[in-house]
């Protein structure tokens, strides 16, 4: 059976299966038939600013309407807004067409079910099973209809602001806002300006091709430069669909999801709002675990993907979880990552404590970490080669205390990720070069290297 779903929905290159109009039509028909069986006849669809998103939405709508399911099309909105409206309108399903932090060549789709939570892996497998069959479409007497609601922005703006105290203001606080030329490009500036902030706006002019292009949470150079040149108090960078956020302190240092989770957890504990502990993933920096341990906050890691964080939070009845990449779940407000709400909560802590983002991060010391991406490769089996395994087996001896290595297939891109972490950045650099050389000797590969800390 062909597997279509990754860690966050379906994703791929536009024009190649599964990111084609034909596939999205079939996907719409498959989902529609399943929903119709359960007497679900209406869903909500939003999208990001990619050129291909409109075409894919039209194809999906056609498949859905053909089997009797009606669609509320809300246009360009952040992913967490679709989660919010799925719950607000008491709908069974919400859909977002987006490839999140990927560039315009990619696109994808993700789903929410009742109460705005991500679709379960079990339901994804059910959809995949049907997609692997030949679809027979009978003539439906009642076709679904499509309605367009483009005036929902203010409702979501009001919701985001409602997560703050009534008298909260950001007067004269200078913020560089990077909207990644994506789904937050209209909403985010309105929200921060309405709160009184002095907003320096970047990457808020989408043209369908520039989403996440030298901007957004995976490319921070420009926002870091602007924070310094504008003498801003901090920077806030969203990804293309607004469910991730990375922040920049006034010295130009990035503050990722692990550090944001630490700031929130420490504040929650101080204010007696913390229920139990917090949840991260297997990619969470070891420095987070050490810092949380020092202040007595339990920490559990789960598989990559914010839905696994949500599942563990519900199981433990905890409230906070995050991925290093900037997906931060605050269950008091939303069941998914919401970049705007997360950044607002951090700003509230800064003002409550009369502090700075830099100071709030001062007692979490991130371990040096490098991520090696082996590009255009989804066959992880070659890493079992004895030469590669010989190098990997020596990492503990070479890197020392607190060191670890993780190898995994990316759930959002066509690549293999290798994370190397330890106490000494020099040793990690040396070891990563050794590993790249031996991998290349076994199989010629293209690499990208990200130095995290």
Curated annotation (Swiss-Prot):
A GO cellular component entry from the record: cytosol
Cofactors, names only: Mg(2+)
Enzyme class, broadest EC rank: isomerase
Enzyme Commission identifier(s): 5.4.2.10
PTM info: Activated by phosphorylation.
Entry's cofactor comment: Binds 1 Mg(2+) ion per subunit.
Protein's UniProt keywords contain Acetylation: no
InterPro entries in UniProt: A-D-PHexomutase_a/b/a-I (IPR005844), A-D-PHexomutase_a/b/a-I/II/III (IPR016055), A-D-PHexomutase_a/b/a-II (IPR005845), A-D-PHexomutase_a/b/a-III (IPR005846), A-D-PHexomutase_C_sf (IPR036900), Alpha-D-phosphohexomutase_SF (IPR005841), GlmM_bact (IPR006352), Phosphoglucosamine_mutase (IPR050060)
Keyword Phosphoprotein assigned: yes
Amino-acid positions noted as binding Mg(2+) in the UniProt annotation, renumbered to this chain: 100, 239, 241, 243
Catalytic activity: alpha-D-glucosamine 1-phosphate = D-glucosamine 6-phosphate
Protein family per UniProt: Belongs to the phosphohexose mutase family.
Protein's job: Catalyzes the conversion of glucosamine-6-phosphate to glucosamine-1-phosphate.
NCBIfam families: glmM (TIGR01455), PRK10887.1 (NF008139)
PANTHER family in UniProt: PHOSPHOGLUCOMUTASE (ALPHA-D-GLUCOSE-1,6-BISPHOSPHATE-DEPENDENT), PHOSPHOHEXOSE MUTASE
Protein name as annotated: Phosphoglucosamine mutase
Species of the source: Buchnera aphidicola subsp. Baizongia pistaciae (strain Bp)
